[in-house]
Curated annotation (Swiss-Prot):
Source organism phylogeny: Eukaryota, Discoba, Euglenozoa, Euglenida, Spirocuta
Annotated InterPro entries: DNA-dir_RNA_pol_bsu_ext_1_sf, DNA-dir_RNA_pol_su2, DNA-dir_RNAP_su2_dom, DNA-dir_RNAP_su2_hyb_sf, RNA_pol_bsu_bac, RNA_pol_bsu_CS, RNA_pol_Rpb2_2_sf, RNA_pol_Rpb2_3
HAMAP family: RNApol_bact_RpoB
This protein's record includes keyword DNA-binding: no
SUPFAM superfamilies hit by this protein: beta and beta-prime subunits of DNA dependent RNA-polymerase
Family note: Belongs to the RNA polymerase beta chain family.
Name of the protein this chain belongs to: DNA-directed RNA polymerase subunit beta
Complex formation: In plastids the minimal PEP RNA polymerase catalytic core is composed of four subunits: alpha, beta, beta', and beta''. When a (nuclear-encoded) sigma factor is associated with the core the holoenzyme is formed, which can initiate transcription.
EC number: 2.7.7.6
Broad class of the protein's primary localization: plastid
Localization per record: Plastid
Length: 1076
């Protein structure tokens, strides 16, 4: 528990802080293992204290453009001695390159933006488990073997190492470690010793790789001691880690012993045994594995340090191997060249350290690790929530297929630390979670949540905020925040103590939550009227917001919860001023701000003298740079096929304060989060078109580009730079009309700004045709050659504008990339959603004149099915819909705190009725608020102008257009690829695959009695290969169709049965149709 004044500082602080610790402490700690290597006649020294980091050669933006990796170079001074003589002087060598984290908390690897997810794993330490016949104490280290101490009913004590069946008596084990009988008896009370320490009669002891019955008596103890020393007392093979040592000290010692020892000590085993005796006497409950006090979070830095540790071990073994090879080679040379004089030994700096191999290993971790994923940057919310995910999967975590329901369930310790709502759906449910809003992670890796101090019923906000972990909740009682307004003395309140919830008096409360939505994640926290929805629908609402496309005409929501500004700030979609100053330049590429001038302490000193220059460089009060330059990202496609653009919102000579937004990203407007549009909605059934969550929309949404999104497609090609120039990019393409190449440059690449409509030439490429040598000689003499057109064409259905072209040189070839931007208007089959899990697919687009309209003649834009609300229990959409209606009429915006019912009963309803009444009075539209039917009015049918029989709910809802677009989903097989082995069409849209004529389709044709058509569909038109090849000849020559053969699919079935050992074949009267 540490006293803090602020609840949060930065939502991305977990990643950035962890990576900084890795660079400052983690790398140095790992390099200490190879600081001095002495082997044979060699002595290799790495001067770690003089370690340096070299800045990246390219900026993060240029790495994205050029498909490079954004990394830093580690430089270490290295010195090599041979037989006491220096053969390689102390010089800086390039040790390796590691990917460097950007300001956004991401890594750029091969031009792709990646993120490493936090991992939640079991904490190192002691775990007690009670069984019917015995008591088990398991010691889990950070790295090394697991140890289990078993105590049975007979009071016999054994030790097991890892998963080995044979156990070792504890007394024997302690003797081998070097503890005498006297020391064991002194550490335990005499009574405890006689009662609790019975010596086993077991004589045969087995330790991995050692069988004591096979050893002589003299070497017995020495060999075992060496084995145990290497397993548990050697820091290279065994490491408890800071957390493991902290937990052991806290459980078995009154004061912290061995704080700097990361290995097991013999005294630790005695302490654990003492602890087990106490537990047996007191009957303490066994440890709950799912409790957060038994779990730690490994962030980017810790995961990279674990990888770096493995790399260091490999380096050590390879250096020793190379030394041995060098010594063997030298001995062989000395045998043959005895008469020659001794030559100086020359060793290159790359002989022992190959920086390229080390860099590739680290790069492989970033690209192949299951916790490393491509950043989901569809919108600012999806980007931020992806960075705050926490996974129990991965290396050292839980296996997805073996995870039980107990592991997936919500635990009481999650309160205020892990969101109980937001999780992945499907197989990863309960395994991939999301961190709560205001949490932080302490130095041991435990999650802490903020609380206010309560003393004798008085809430002490002035004392600041206390961060408490699950471990520290043992002896305190915590109350929720909803008692703040109605906090009365002499009354019982709901409290949490030792992961249990019950009612207790106000005097017993020690801490209280800081806010009502403290337990929620960032995604669920921006859903207004959250408390009126079912938890499953809130989960859907959170996931739908992450799938929302940024629209062409952005619009913020009229109802917010206050977290939207934080999301824009910490997702780095906006640029924030680091210091106050005046704007002296502002454009689409950069913003320059002149800093506030400060008087120098050394104003009258002549700066031309070198002595003073060196002194002044160290003085912090002298400011070298008076201007701060903020580069706006060049238009660049992200992982989600959307342009990442930033636009300046400041002008020249504007005064800027520190922390002010100076440039906005794609998903923000005036600092507000923009994910959808406020659209007029009506809840009624309309001719069955909105049956089962289907959505009917007005033609206005399509015509006025209200739900139009912008997408980017990349087309690329490679040109090999060969001496013979077999391929060439040119505008002069044979047999192509001029109108088809009018948009190409002289280089043969399409111009920026050209319109694309269907299959058009993007890159004009010609290739030399392969001809016989005689004809080729004539072409060489005439300096001409036969040319073939292999130009790159745009996709068939792509309609857009060329916005960018790039050419990259990669070794002996050129990579040409063309970016085409297209508008995608709303259409039938597209998916829309609200913020309350109310999702659906568009079934019908209706003309404006046919849509139902309000009493003032305003046509409704979207018709939703009212039956979807009571069954799904997401009433929050109605609250939002009605409050939005009053917000538009009153021209106001609202911030609604989740769980605001604690202030007084029916708070949400009272607020909505109040605002609807105000809007009725202001606009003088009586139908806006009817006290008998609040939130409802009579709508009119657009087709005949008659009013509907009943009053209908209507209002403005914040509608999101999701990434599931019908145009991208539809796939039809025309002429596809076939598998060469099974002769069946390949699977999937990406391979242009298809399917056979299905079983239900066969039934349909059977129903119509079309026997000959069915025969053709299943044979000649499908996979009767022999007749398929003959059909064109027969049609051209006027011959009749040949009899159908057995299709390949049936032959495949026979082969499958034969592979099972069944002797099945196809026979006719004359011959076998199909042989093995």
């Amino acid at each position: 528990m540490i006293n803090r004044l602020k609840t949060y500082s930065n939502l991305l602080n977990i990643q950035s802080k962890s990576f900084k610790n890795f660079l400052k402490i983690g790398i140095i700690n790992e390099l200490k293992k190879i600081q001095k290597i002495i082997h044979s006649n060699f002595e290799i020294n790495f001067h770690i204290n003089a370690l340096k980091y070299k800045k990246p050669k390219l900026s993060s933006e240029s790495c994205l453009i050029k498909n490079e990796t954004y990394n830093i170079d580690i430089k270490i001074p290295m010195e090599i001695k041979y037989e006491g003589k220096i053969i390689f002087k102390k010089k800086y060598i390039s040790f390796c390159k590691i990917p460097f984290m950007t300001e956004k908390g991401t890594f750029i690897c091969n031009g792709n933006t990646r993120i490493i997810i936090n991992q939640l794993i079991r904490s190192p330490g002691i775990y007690i488990k009670k069984k019917k016949n015995c008591l088990l104490a398991t010691l889990i280290p950070k790295t090394g073997s697991w140890i289990t101490i078993k105590r049975n009913k007979k009071k016999e004590n054994f030790i097991k190492i890892d998963k080995i069946n044979n156990s070792i008596p504890l007394f024997t084990f302690l003797n081998i470690l070097g503890l005498s009988k006297k020391k064991i008896t002194l550490s335990l009370n005499k009574n405890n010793y006689s009662k609790n320490f019975k010596i086993s009669k077991k004589k045969k002891i087995e330790i991995p790789t050692i069988n004591l019955t096979q050893l002589s008596k003299e070497n017995n103890i020495k060999t075992i001691r060496n084995n145990l020393y290497n397993r548990f007392l050697n820091s290279d093979n065994y490491n408890l880690g800071d957390t493991g040592r902290f937990k052991i000290n806290k459980k078995i010692y009154k004061t912290e012993f061995f704080t700097n020892k990361k290995i097991l000590m013999p005294e630790d085993f005695l302490g654990i045994f003492n602890y087990m005796i106490k537990i047996k006497n007191i009957n303490i409950k066994s440890n709950k594995i799912d409790d957060l006090k038994n779990k730690i979070v490994l962030s980017v830095g810790e995961l990279m340090q674990n990888k770096f540790n493995n790399i260091i071990k490999d380096i050590y073994t390879k250096i020793i191997e190379k030394i041995n090879k060098f010594e063997q080679k030298k001995k062989q040379e000395e045998k043959y060249n005895k008469e020659k004089k001794e030559e100086k030994i020359k060793i290159n700096k790359t002989y022992f350290i190959n920086s390229k191999n080390l860099t590739d290993n680290i790069k492989k971790f970033i690209t192949t690790n299951p916790l490393s994923q491509l950043l989901n940057d569809l919108n600012p919310l999806s980007e931020l929530t992806h960075k705050r995910k926490i996974s129990t999967l991965g290396i050292g975590g839980i296996e997805k297929n073996k995870a039980s329901t107990k592991i997936r369930e919500i635990h009481n310790s999650h309160y205020g630390r892990i969101c109980p709502i937001e999780t992945s759906e499907g197989k990863n449910a309960g395994l991939v979670l999301s961190l709560a809003k205001d949490i932080r992670i302490n130095k041991h890796g435990f999650i802490e949540s903020p609380f206010y101090k309560v003393i004798k019923g008085n809430i002490k906000k002035n004392k600041g905020i206390f961060f408490i972990s699950s471990e520290n909740e043992k002896n305190i009682k915590i109350a929720p925040c909803d008692i703040l307004k109605n906090f009365k003395l002499n009354k019982n309140y709901g409290v949490k103590n030792k992961n249990e919830f019950y009612y207790d008096s106000y005097k017993s409360i020690n801490f209280i939550s800081t806010s009502t939505d403290q337990f929620n994640s960032i995604g669920t926290g921006i859903i207004p009227f959250l408390e009126h929805n079912d938890a499953n629908r809130v989960l859907m609402g959170a996931t739908m917001q992450k799938q929302a496309l940024i629209l062409k005409n952005k619009e913020p929501s009229l109802i917010e919860t206050g977290r939207e500004i934080l999301i824009n700030r910490d997702s780095k979609s906006t640029i924030i001023a680091k210091e106050s100053g005046t704007v002296i330049y502002s454009s689409s590429k950069k913003i320059i701000i002149q800093k506030k001038s400060k008087k120098s302490k050394f104003k009258n000193i002549n700066l031309f003298k070198k002595y003073f220059k060196k002194k002044l460089k160290k003085n912090k009060k002298i400011k070298k740079h008076k201007h701060t330059i903020y580069l706006l990202n060049i238009d660049e496609k992200n992982n989600s096929n959307i342009y990442q653009t930033r636009t300046s919102i400041v002008k020249k000579n504007d005064w800027i304060k520190k922390g002010q937004i100076i440039a906005e990203g794609i998903g923000s407007l005036n600092g507000n989060l923009c994910l959808g549009k406020n659209i007029l909605v009506g809840y009624l059934s309309w001719e069955g078109y909105n049956f089962e969550d289907a959505i009917i929309i007005s033609e206005r949404l399509r015509n006025e580009d209200i739900l139009t999104s912008i997408h980017v497609k990349k087309c690329k090609s490679f040109l090999i730079n060969h001496k013979e120039k077999k391929e060439e990019i040119t505008k002069n393409i044979p047999d192509i009309k001029l109108k088809n190449v009018k948009n190409l440059n002289n280089n043969g690449i399409i111009k920026i700004g050209s319109k694309i409509n269907g299959k058009e030439i993007l890159i004009g490429i010609i290739k030399k045709r392969l001809i016989n040598y005689e004809v080729e000689l004539i072409y060489e003499i005439l300096s001409e050659y036969e040319r073939k057109n292999i130009s790159v064409l745009s996709p068939k259905n792509l309609v857009g504008i060329v916005t960018n072209t790039k050419i990259h040189k990669i070794k002996n070839c050129y990579q040409i990339e063309i970016y085409i931007t297209e508008k995608k208007k709303i259409q039938i089959g597209d998916k829309l959603s609200g913020r309350h899990g109310n999702k659906g697919v568009i079934s019908k687009i209706i003309p404006i004149v046919d849509m139902p309209y309000l009493p003032d003649g305003t046509p409704i834009d979207i018709i939703l099915n009212p039956l979807g609300i009571p069954s799904r229990m997401n009433v929050g959409q109605i609250y939002e819909c009605l409050l939005n209606l009053s917000a538009i009429n009153l021209k106001e915006r609202y911030k609604i705190q989740p769980f605001d019912e604690y202030q007084y009963k029916n708070n949400s309803e009272i607020l909505i009725y109040k605002k609807l009444n105000q809007s009725r009075k202001k606009t003088k539209k009586e139908w806006l608020f009817n006290p008998n039917n609040p939130g409802k009015t009579i709508l009119f049918n657009g087709k005949n102008g008659k009013p509907f029989k009943q009053t209908i709910s209507f209002g403005y809802s914040y509608i999101l257009k999701l990434m599931h677009i019908a145009e991208e989903k539809i796939h039809a097989k025309t002429i596809s690829n076939y598998s060469s082995i099974i002769k069946q069409p390949v699977k999937g849209k990406s391979k242009n695959g298809g399917q056979r004529f299905g079983e239900m389709e066969v039934w349909a044709i059977e129903g119509f009695g079309a026997a000959f058509l069915l025969q053709e569909l299943l044979t000649i038109k499908s996979d009767d290969l022999h007749n398929k090849s003959q059909i064109l000849k027969n049609l051209m020559n006027g011959l009749s169709m040949s009899k159908p053969n057995v299709p390949e699919s049936f032959k495949l079935l026979i082969l499958e049965l034969q592979s099972l050992g069944l002797n099945i074949n196809i026979f006719t009267k004359k011959k076998t149709l199909f042989t093995k």
